[in-house]
Amino acid sequence: LIVQLLGAARIYAAEDPSYEKIALVYRAHGASLELLPLGADGIRSDALAATRASVLHITPYRSYPSNVTASAAKRREYIRWASEPGRYIVEDDFSSEFTVASKPEETVFSLAESGNVIYLNTFSQTVAPSLRMGYMVLSEKLAAQYAERIGFYSCTVPLFEQLVLAEL
């Protein structure tokens, strides 16, 4: 959906290492992908500055398989990077709800004001693994673009499961 929303002609970037299927999905949809090396607190600054990508796919909390969590400074660096026209961040936040801290990490989506962060999450870890439901949060601008370009898709999650989740 991300490639269909933003376009395959862009260069995408993802963390290295990252969940192997991220690269497979982008490439399967015809997107060029750069892998950016992780440091102790997120993508290395030199690699981020040098990338030709216009879309950055990040897992800022406990990135898999490295278990690296992006620092607050690194999250701000990602937002600064995305402040250039035509740049986007895809924030894949699959496990931030599970934290030993009293307060979960702030998402890049919640910190960015530009409307160019796409937030992805799932209910598989917080509610039940058998509920294979994810969700995407878009800014108003991106939601309008979604409706125009790929709004014809229908939901693949059975209605019964959606209703059960809504009651929780």
Question: Where are these predicted regions, by residue range?
Answer:
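Generic, low-specificity signal for short hydrophobic/alpha-helical stretches with a mild N-terminal bias
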Residues: 30, 60, 64, 90, ...
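A generic "structured core" feature
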Residues: 16, 20-25, 89, 99, ...
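Conserved Walker B
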Residues: 93-95
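Conserved core of the PLP fold type I
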Residues: 1-85, 97-98, 103-111, 115
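PLP-dependent aminotransferase class I/II
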Residues: 118-168
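Generic beta-sheet signal
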Residues: 15, 36, 90-91, 120
